[in-house]
Design a protein with these regions (language model features):
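Non-ligating segments of multi-cofactor redox enzymes
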Residues: 1-211
Length: 211
C-alpha cells in the first residue's frame, strides 16, 4: 500500500486538485473503527505501510516515548493539526485546487515528521498520536461488538518470551490478556496480526466477537 502514498505525493504536487483524495484516509479510518477498531491503520493506511515497509529498514527501533501516548498530548496534536488545516484553507482558498493543496501540504509535512520520528524511535511512532488514529481509537468499541476483530491469547501463555510485544508496531503488550475470554481489546491495536504470526507456542489467534 505504501506506493499509493508516493504516487499521491508526486501526482498531487503537479495536479493540486488530486490532493482532495486524501480525505479518504481521514474519514475512512474513523468510520471503520466503529466496527473494527483501528483496522484501517494496520491494513489500508498507505503511510502506515510506508513506515512498516520502508522506514523500518532504517529505524533505530527504540521505545516510543510514553508521553506521546498520553491523552493530553494526543488532544493537543488533534487540535494543532486541525488548526493548521484551517489556516491552510484560509491561505490557499476554498477552491478545488486550494483544498487539494491544503491536503497535500498536510500529508507531506506529517509524513516527514513521521519519517524523522521513525528513524529516531520506532517506525510507527507517528501512529501513536496520529489525529485520525486518535479519533479512531476513541470511537473503537470498548467491549467489542458482533464481528469486532480482536486478538485472543490462551491461558497457556506464560508471558515469558514477550515475543508478541517485541514485534508489535505499536509497542503494545498483547500477552497481558492471557486467559481473558474478552481478548486483547486495546483501542490502539491495529489488528495487523504480527503478534499472532510471531508467537512461538501458537497460543494466540484472531477472533471476532459473537455478541
Amino acid at each position: 500500500m505504501f506506493w499509493i502514498l508516493l504516487i499521491y505525493l508526486v501526482m498531487a504536487y503537479f495536479v493540486p486538485e488530486l490532493g482532495v483524495i486524501a480525505i479518504i484516509c481521514m474519514i475512512g479510518p474513523v468510520l471503520m473503527a466503529v466496527k473494527k477498531g483501528r483496522y484501517w491503520c494496520g491494513h489500508f493506511c498507505p503511510r502506515g505501510s510506508f513506515y512498516d515497509r520502508v522506514v523500518s529498514r532504517f529505524s533505530s527501533h527504540k521505545r516510543i516515548p510514553q508521553f506521546v501516548r498520553s491523552k493530553g498530548f494526543r488532544i493537543f496534536m488533534l487540535c494543532f493539526i486541525f488548526a493548521m488545516f484551517g489556516l491552510q484553507f484560509y491561505m490557499n482558498g476554498v477552491t478545488l485546487a486550494g483544498v487539494g493543496r491544503t491536503f497535500w501540504n498536510l500529508i507531506l509535512v506529517t509524513t516527514i515528521v513521521g519519517v524523522v520520528l521513525g528513524f529516531i524511535y520506532a517506525p510507527r511512532t507517528w501512529c501513536t498520536f496520529c489525529p485520525m488514529g486518535t479519533l479512531s481509537a476513541w470511537v473503537t468499541p470498548k467491549g467489542g461488538k458482533k464481528g469486532f476483530p480482536y486478538v485472543w491469547v490462551s491461558l497457556a501463555c506464560q508471558m515469558k518470551c514477550k515475543r508478541c510485544a517485541k514485534v508489535c508496531p505499536m509497542q503494545l503488550t498483547p500477552y497481558d490478556s492471557g486467559g481473558d475470554e474478552n481478548g486483547y481489546l486495546h483501542p490502539d491495536c491495529i489488528k495487523c496480526g504480527n503478534c499472532i504470526n510471531a508467537c512461538p507456542t501458537k497460543v494466540m489467534e484472531k477472533r471476532k466477537c459473537q455478541e
